[in-house]
């Protein structure tokens, strides 16, 4: 299956034919299209300081880059910036006649292979993908992680080991939490052996467990846990609440629901807390976004939660953590709200 995440895709074209192809693609997919001042048309942005400079800026700000032109041009421009398959953006190259779509960089973890297939399907072109798992018609651990927006404590090592096992035709099992069945059904799991029951494993060389849980039973084979980011935390706190206290209480709340900390997807609060140092540091430490909502937006859902007159007077709404978690999870809340030392934390699940 192709799972494309077109959050921010930059496209670069250098010829009239490239501009024409870019216009075809832009009509079907959200793109930011760049070209030279000479070729610029409505909907295109001119290069800032030249093609190479613009492309290199985009490499650090977009999740995917598409180049219409020669592969060598893309390679020479981006070579100084290429760093790591887990952090570099997806890079795809298309010839200006739209006959070949080439996955150049970050095929699995960055999603370039999925984007390549998607673009090729749109254009009726030939997708050119060279990663070993794909040419052997198998998925890959980093592809699965990308499709599930999942994390792992040592993904780099696991990807190297598991992908090698897959292409060597070893038996790698795949088990998942029951509540993730629908999502797994939308992922590419070719090459993995589905496992229904951890207590009754088939003959396996290794096992991948896709789970939000903070622990797993003892297993008789080498195994890794892949944790989808699905948990959100609405947090209210007093001004200048220290980061260590916030981190301790969040960890306790996750533990109370038997959730792996890696499952955290976002932290939310009221707009007044946008500059709160402890919350900013907490989100940074957890490597998740810190999202804030206006008091007006939170008030729409505060009737679902106990309120505080003091909090209402201070921030304009009687409850912060509950409504914030509600907005982040569309009302899919988990457990009871933690209230301690001026901090409130409400958890939810967002898909």
Swiss-Prot record:
Q: One GO biological process from the UniProt record?
A: cobalamin biosynthetic process
Instruction: Name the InterPro entries for this protein.
Output: CbiG_hydrolase (IPR052553), CbiG_mid (IPR021745), CbiG_N (IPR021744), CobE/GbiG_C (IPR002750), CobE/GbiG_C_sf (IPR036518), GbiG_N_sf (IPR038029)
Q: Which SUPFAM superfamilies match?
A: CbiG N-terminal domain-like (SSF159672), CobE/GbiG C-terminal domain-like (SSF159664)
**Pathway of action:** Cofactor biosynthesis; adenosylcobalamin biosynthesis; cob(II)yrinate a,c-diamide from sirohydrochlorin (anaerobic route): step 5/10
Keywords, in A-Z order = Cobalamin biosynthesis, Hydrolase
Report the enzyme's class at the first EC level: hydrolase
Q: What catalytic activity is recorded?
A: Co-precorrin-5A + H2O = Co-precorrin-5B + acetaldehyde + H(+)
Q: What is its EC number?
A: 3.7.1.12
Q: Which GO terms describe its molecular function?
A: cobalt-precorrin-5A acetaldehyde-lyase activity
Q: Which family does it belong to?
A: Belongs to the CbiG family.
Xref: NCBIfam families:
PRK05788.1-1 (NF004463)
Protein's recorded name = Cobalt-precorrin-5A hydrolase
According to the entry, what is the taxonomic lineage of the organism?
Bacteria, Pseudomonadati, Pseudomonadota, Gammaproteobacteria, Enterobacterales
């Amino acid at each position: 299956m192709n799972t494309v995440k077109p959050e921010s895709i930059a496209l670069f074209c250098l010829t009239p034919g490239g501009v024409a192809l870019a216009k075809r693609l832009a009509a079907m997919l959200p793109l930011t299209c760049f070209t030279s001042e000479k070729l610029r048309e409505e909907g295109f942005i001119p290069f800032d300081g030249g093609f190479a400079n613009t492309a290199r800026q985009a490499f650090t700000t977009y999740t995917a880059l598409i180049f219409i032109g020669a592969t060598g041009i893309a390679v020479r421009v981006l070579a100084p910036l290429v760093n790591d398959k887990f952090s570099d953006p997806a890079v795809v190259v298309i010839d200006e006649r739209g006959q070949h779509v080439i996955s150049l960089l970050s095929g699995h973890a960055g999603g370039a292979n999925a984007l390549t297939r998607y673009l090729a399907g749109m254009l009726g072109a030939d997708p050119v993908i060279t990663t070993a798992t794909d040419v052997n018609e198998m998925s890959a651990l980093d592809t699965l992680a990308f499709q599930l927006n999942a994390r792992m404590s040592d993904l780099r090592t696991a990807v190297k080991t598991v992908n090698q096992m897959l292409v060597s035709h070893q038996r790698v099992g795949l088990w998942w939490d029951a509540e993730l069945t629908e999502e797994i059904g939308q992922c590419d799991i070719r090459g993995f052996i589905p496992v229904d029951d951890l207590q009754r494993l088939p003959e396996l060389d290794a096992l991948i467990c896709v789970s939000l849980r903070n622990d797993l039973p003892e297993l008789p084979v080498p195994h890794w846990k892949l944790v989808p980011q699905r948990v959100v935390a609405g947090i209210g706190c007093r001004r200048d609440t220290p980061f260590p206290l916030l981190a301790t209480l969040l960890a306790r709340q996750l533990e109370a629901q038997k959730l792996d900390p890696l499952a955290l997807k976002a932290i939310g609060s009221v707009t007044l807390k946008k500059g709160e140092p402890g919350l900013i540091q907490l989100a940074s430490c957890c490597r998740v976004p810190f999202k804030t909502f206006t008091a007006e937006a939170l008030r729409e859902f505060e009737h679902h939660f106990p309120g505080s007159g003091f909090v209402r007077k201070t921030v304009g709404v009687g409850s912060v953590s509950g409504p914030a978690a509600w907005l982040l999870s569309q009302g899919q809340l988990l457990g009871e709200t933690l209230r301690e030392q001026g901090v409130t934390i409400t958890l939810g699940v967002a898909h």
